[in-house]
Each structure stands twice: as structure tokens, then as C-alpha cells.
């Protein structure tokens, strides 16, 4: 069950300035996706997407369940045909029967009106791509778009989009207007260029159609595979919406980020930059790996920024010549023994220089002060000094004595 975040502030002594170090999030409207709410001050929602063929009903059910069990709160499924839309209905029912209801987003692309109308009957949210929903084959001989041609296609988009908007509106369901930098419509490219501005205008065109039909259960995304483009597009989208009095939540992601360490760094560079600006209400880290590997990255980003706390926060120095014990080995032992104690802050410091001061905000500290011995702290208070080989054991005993231990 989701809960509203509790604002926290950091304070200094009475004669010093008080600084609020919490991120001020952009105010957005709440958008319900099943039993999950995006925006409206609710915690940033974690999403992913299965990579099974939707026609494989059992495989898709298993994949959705695997993601949900490790913390994925909304799961996206590709729906490239009517047959896939019908299969998704069965997937949804089988999930409810064999596991539990999970909020699902149907991903619809090329000329997807009929598919979207079918799948909207069965799931909570439909994602459409403005560049592909009404797909116009590029004309290699074209040199410009006249205003009349631009508006003519705009009317065609409205005619095609309106039935889906009305269906979602009447059922109380949601839509993501998911713009991708790599698939802008030809008329947008001619008019605005291959730019963040073109991405924003593409989204605004669809938003205005939705608003004209009194539908506002909308989430927006502005994804790109290059971080500077992605960041610029989201910032511009947030500014334009603020200027226009719009308050739609934003779904953040770097599309096609790749794999391994660099894929994680690339996604974090884009997503965390925007979240630190207060922009973003739901995130997906897109990796060329098993979808399950995306979820820990999402939660790590949110924890590092102080937006959600779902694991133990470890504070540890990088080690140097002053370190009085094998810091890497001890940190591993401490982590393996305490990683289930969600909500605690635990510091492991190699010497007195980086000890009490750097770990002042931690609940518990493990500090090397004397060769062969470890000093254990509760907050800023040194509790006891113990032999190094008993350090981890005594840290656990201290946590237990405070009533903050739970068995894994």
C-alpha cells in the first residue's frame, strides 16, 4: 500500500542557519493506475517491462509476477496486434487468479487505435507513442510541410485518438503519452527539427486533444537515448506545462541505455539529474539485461536522493593508509548481516579521522580507533570498545539491545 511521504528537514544549532536538504518535487496531479498512484505527492513509482511474447500467456504471467515480487509496482507489456490484446486479457485474469492483481500498462505503437481500444477493456493504462500512433510513411521527396498539411494530419490524429480517450475517460483508466526522440513524426521533424522542442510539441498536441475531451488521467514521458537530449526535453516539458497551467506527472527514463555498469551510470545520470530538480513521478531504468535487474537500480537511485528508503543506508569511507582493519571485508560482513534491517543507517569507518564526524547522522557506527579494537557507536555516542574479531557480532548485539533487530 502506498503512503504519502513524510517531509524531513535537517537542522543545525540555534545560532546557525537552518537548511532544508529535501528535494522539492514539482506539484503534479495524482493519476491512478489500478491500486498505484503516480504523482500527487505520492512516492516515485518504480516500473519495468517484461520481454516475453505476450502470446505466451504462462510465460508473461510468470514474468510479471517475478517483477512485482521484487518491487516493480507497474508492469508494461507490449501489444503489437489484436491477438496480443486478447492474450493480455487472459494474462490479467490469470494473474488475479493465481497471484494477485498487478497494474499493467499496454504498450501500443504503429496505427494502434483498434489495438488500444481492445486492450483498454482489460488493463489499467495504455501507452501510446505520438510519433507512431497515426503513422505517416516518410516522403523522401518532401522539402516542407505547409500549415494546411500540418493541420490536416492533426485532424486525422484527433479523429483516431478521440475514441481511445473517451474509452479511457469513461472507464477511469490512464494513458501515457510516451514521446521518443528517435520516432518523432515527420511533420514534427520538418517543423521543429530533431530537437527537444519537437518532442514537447508532439506531447502537447496529444495533451490538448485529451483535454478537449475532458480527459486528464495522463502521464507524460520524453525519452531519448542521449542523456543531454533527455534531460533538456523533460526540463522543457516541465516548464511548458507550468507556463500553460498543466500539472501532469512525468515518467522518467533513458531509452536504450545498454547494459552493465555503463548502462546503469547512463540511466542514473539522466534520471537522478531530473529527480534532483524535483522533476519526475515514476521511473524506469531500461537495461539490455533481464528486467529483474532494473528494479534494484531504480530503488538505489531513489534511496540515494532521499526520495524513498527501502534498504539499509551504509556509510563507509574509501579506505586509506590510516585504516586500522580490512574495510572492504568488514563492510561486506556488516552488509550481509544487516541488509534486511530496512530503515537503518549504519556507518563503517576505518579510522578516527573519518569516524564520528562523517557518520554523525548514522544510527550505528563501527569505527577503527585502536589497532586490534573496534569502537561501536549509537549515533554520536561511543558505546563500547570490542576486539576486532568480535566487532560485527557486537554490532548486532547492540542493535538487538535497542530493540531494532528483526530476524532475516
UniProtKB/Swiss-Prot annotation:
Binds 1 [4Fe-4S] cluster. Pathway: Isoprenoid biosynthesis; isopentenyl diphosphate biosynthesis via DXP pathway; isopentenyl diphosphate from 1-deoxy-D-xylulose 5-phosphate: step 5/6. Its cofactor is [4Fe-4S] cluster. GO terms for molecular function: 4 iron, 4 sulfur cluster binding; 4-hydroxy-3-methylbut-2-en-1-yl diphosphate synthase activity (ferredoxin); iron ion binding. It catalyses: (2E)-4-hydroxy-3-methylbut-2-enyl diphosphate + 2 oxidized [2Fe-2S]-[ferredoxin] + H2O = 2-C-methyl-D-erythritol 2,4-cyclic diphosphate + 2 reduced [2Fe-2S]-[ferredoxin] + H(+). GO terms for biological process: isopentenyl diphosphate biosynthetic process, methylerythritol 4-phosphate pathway; terpenoid biosynthetic process. Keywords: 4Fe-4S, Iron, Iron-sulfur, Isoprene biosynthesis, Metal-binding, Oxidoreductase. Pfam families: GcpE (PF04551). Converts 2C-methyl-D-erythritol 2,4-cyclodiphosphate (ME-2,4cPP) into 1-hydroxy-2-methyl-2-(E)-butenyl 4-diphosphate. NCBIfam families: ispG_gcpE, PRK00366.1. Belongs to the IspG family. This is 4-hydroxy-3-methylbut-2-en-1-yl diphosphate synthase (ferredoxin). It comes from Nostoc sp. (strain PCC 7120 / SAG 25.82 / UTEX 2576).
Amino acid at each position: 500500500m502506498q503512503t504519502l511521504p513524510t517531509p524531513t528537514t535537517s537542522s543545525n544549532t540555534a545560532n546557525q542557519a537552518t537548511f532544508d536538504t529535501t528535494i522539492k518535487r514539482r506539484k503534479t496531479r495524482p493519476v491512478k493506475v489500478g491500486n498505484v498512484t503516480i504523482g500527487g505527492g505520492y512516492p516515485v513509482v518504480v516500473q519495468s517491462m517484461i520481454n516475453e511474447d505476450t502470446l505466451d500467456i504462462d510465460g508473461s504471467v510468470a514474468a510479471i509476477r517475478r517483477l512485482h515480487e521484487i518491487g516493480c509496482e507497474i508492469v508494461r507489456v507490449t501489444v503489437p496486434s489484436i491477438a496480443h490484446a486478447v492474450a493480455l486479457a487472459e494474462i490479467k485474469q490469470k494473474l488475479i487468479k493465481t497471484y494477485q492483481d498487478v497494474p499493467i500498462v499496454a504498450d501500443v505503437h504503429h496505427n494502434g487505435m483498434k489495438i488500444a481500444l481492445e486492450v483498454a477493456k482489460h488493463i489499467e493504462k495504455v501507452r501510446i507513442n505520438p510519433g507512431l500512433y497515426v503513422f505517416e510513411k516518410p516522403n523522401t521527396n518532401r522539402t516542407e510541410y505547409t500549415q494546411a498539411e500540418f493541420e490536416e494530419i492533426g485532424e486525422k490524429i484527433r479523429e483516431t485518438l478521440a475514441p481511445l480517450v473517451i474509452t479511457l475517460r469513461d472507464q477511469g483508466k490512464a494513458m501515457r503519452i510516451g514521446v521518443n526522440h528517435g520516432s518523432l513524426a515527420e511533420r514534427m521533424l520538418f517543423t521543429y527539427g530533431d530537437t527537444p522542442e519537437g518532442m514537447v510539441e508532439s506531447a502537447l498536441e496529444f495533451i490538448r486533444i485529451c483535454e478537449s475531451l475532458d480527459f486528464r488521467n495522463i502521464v507524460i514521458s520524453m525519452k531519448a537515448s542521449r542523456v543531454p537530449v533527455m534531460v533538456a526535453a523533460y526540463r522543457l516539458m516541465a516548464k511548458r506545462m507550468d507556463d500553460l497551467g498543466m500539472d501532469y506527472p512525468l515518467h522518467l527514463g533513458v531509452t536504450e541505455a545498454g547494459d552493465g555498469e555503463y548502462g546503469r551510470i547512463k540511466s542514473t545520470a539522466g534520471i537522478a539529474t531530473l529527480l534532483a530538480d524535483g522533476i519526475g513521478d515514476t521511473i524506469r531504468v531500461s537495461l539490455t539485461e533481464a528486467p529483474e535487474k532494473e528494479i534494484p537500480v531504480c530503488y538505489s537511485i531513489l534511496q540515494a536522493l532521499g526520495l524513498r528508503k527501502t534498504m539499509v543506508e551504509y556509510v563507509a569511507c574509501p579506505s586509506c593508509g590510516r585504516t586500522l582493519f580490512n574495510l572492504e571485508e568488514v563492510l561486506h560482513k556488516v552488509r550481509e548481516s544487516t541488509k534486511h534491517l530496512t530503515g537503518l543507517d549504519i556507518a563503517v569507518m576505518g579510522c578516527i579521522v573519518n569516524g564520528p564526524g562523517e557518520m554523525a547522522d548514522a544510527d550505528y557506527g563501527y569505527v577503527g580507533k585502536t589497532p586490534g579494537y573496534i569502537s561501536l557507536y549509537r549515533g554520536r555516542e561511543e558505546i563500547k570498545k570490542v576486539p576486532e574479531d568480535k566487532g560485527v557480532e557486537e554490532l548486532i548485539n547492540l542493535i538487538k539491545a535497542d530493540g531494532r533487530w528483526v530476524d532475516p
